[in-house]
């Protein structure tokens, strides 16, 4: 069955041709070019989706301050969700049961992944590790679970080889587009951006025509543990309701609702940021 409504969350670190933090940082000389590379990959997915019969495509700018995509560079058929903070779903803001499939573009591996481009989990400045029921979760994992809570499968992901490998394990049948091989945190061997867009366009069309994955719904209850970078951050995070501090840098929260997991993670991260002085 053709997916009529498509949700796209696009980050920046996993875009083809991107290897260094300077490229994704507002104010750097490299940033404007990276914005265009990001827009091109978003447009490739939009074009593929509409070519295969989609009727609505929503693109959520999911990097940093979430003001990276320039509206005039985006396919006019798409809707663009830009700006932040996006409360309560962040990178998945706008995703709900009205969508038939989700796509994650420009994504990166979870914090602590060896030889992965700019590995981190939501906030590299605050989060050392995020675990659910004892298993480390990256952005792709938790965002897929949030989509799954609405019955939305993730059909396509794109990024470096480490991220794609993590998603292959998490989401059986997902279409992965590896746009680069990470050699370290700041260097990679990338395919040409035009080739990346071609692969994304073709894959998006295939996924809209027929999605091979099921919604990701991890079994509740959820024991959520987050290790922050330092004890001062944990001092602030423990002010959040229903939080148990389990160590100098460690926090714990329990719930039966994956959407509460996302809200608590966001609250902890926001509180941790107040200790960045």
Predicted stretch roles:
Residues 196-277:
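C-terminal accessory domains and tails appended to enzymatic cores
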Residues 6-24, 34, 38:
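N-terminal glycine-rich anion-binding loops that anchor highly charged ligand groups
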Residues 75-95:
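A glycine-rich helix N-cap at a beta->alpha junction
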Residues 146-154, 158-208:
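Active-site rim beta-loop-alpha module in soluble metabolic enzymes
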Residues 9-10, 60-61, 102-107, 157-158, ...:
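Short beta-strand segments
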Residues 15, 29, 33-60, 66, ...:
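Alpha/propeptide regions of enzymes that mature by internal proteolysis
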Residues 64-77:
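Glycine-rich loop at the start of a catalytic domain that most often binds anionic cofactors/ligands
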Residues 124-150, 158-162:
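Active-site glycine-rich loop that binds ribose-phosphate moieties when present
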């Amino acid at each position: 069955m053709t997916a009529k409504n498509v949700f796209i969350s696009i980050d920046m670190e996993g875009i083809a041709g991107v290897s260094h933090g300077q490229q994704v940082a507002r104010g750097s000389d490299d940033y404007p070019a990276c914005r265009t590379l990001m827009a091109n990959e978003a447009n490739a997915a939009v074009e593929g989706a509409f070519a295969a019969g989609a009727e609505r495509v929503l693109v959520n700018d999911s990097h940093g301050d979430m003001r990276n995509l320039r509206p005039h560079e985006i396919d006019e058929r798409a809707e663009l969700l830009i700006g932040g903070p996006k409360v309560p779903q962040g990178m998945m803001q706008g995703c709900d049961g009205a969508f038939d499939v989700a796509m994650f573009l420009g994504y990166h591996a979870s914090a602590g992944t060896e030889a992965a481009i700019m590995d981190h989990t939501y906030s590299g400045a605050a989060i050392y590790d995020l675990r659910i029921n004892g298993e480390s979760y990256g952005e792709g994992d938790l965002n897929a679970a949030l989509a799954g809570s609405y019955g939305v499968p993730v059909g396509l992901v794109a990024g470096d080889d480490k991220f794609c490998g993590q998603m292959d394990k998490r989401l059986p049948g997902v279409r992965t587009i590896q746009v680069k091989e990470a050699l370290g945190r700041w260097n990679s061997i990338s395919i040409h951006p035009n080739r990346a867009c071609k692969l994304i366009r073709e894959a998006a069309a295939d996924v809209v025509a027929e999605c091979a994955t099921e919604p990701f719904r991890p079994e509740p209850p959820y024991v959520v543990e987050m290790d922050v970078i330092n004890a001062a951050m944990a001092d602030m995070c423990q002010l959040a309701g229903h939080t148990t501090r389990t160590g100098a840098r460690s926090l714990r929260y329990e719930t039966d609702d994956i959407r509460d997991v996302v809200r608590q993670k966001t609250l902890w991260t926001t509180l941790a940021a107040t200790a960045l002085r």
